[in-house]
């Protein structure tokens, strides 16, 4: 059976599922090299090498890939933070290991505003109604509040509010 080395950049359950699927392959002898946000017992048990990088720092992920580059055939990244910070660009440039995730310039999760504007341009039928509230457009917080509440009334309070920047799943209000 052909041996394949896979770098997995992990934050949580999604990447655990990837590690599980890779290590259960019946077609390949897969060895996983995991760069994890925290010590995940499942990943530790299945990884040939496991390293904890608490902030998923792109430079540290790249160093881990460099040390193991002769045994890694490709990598896959789930968490948005290292994608937004250009992990693919850096690892591919310095190691030659192909990485499955968007390049930094295509990391649409970096800005919800840019994401919505892009969707409006290419697939408007799947893009929900949205409005962007720029603080600089308002004289004070009261004017901002009044405008936001007016928009919410128009939507009958059926709305989702998101910050422009990534919030690791913690920034959404319904």
Give each language-model segment a name:
Residues 1-104:
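ATP-binding N-terminal substructure of ATP-dependent carboxylate-amine bond-forming enzymes
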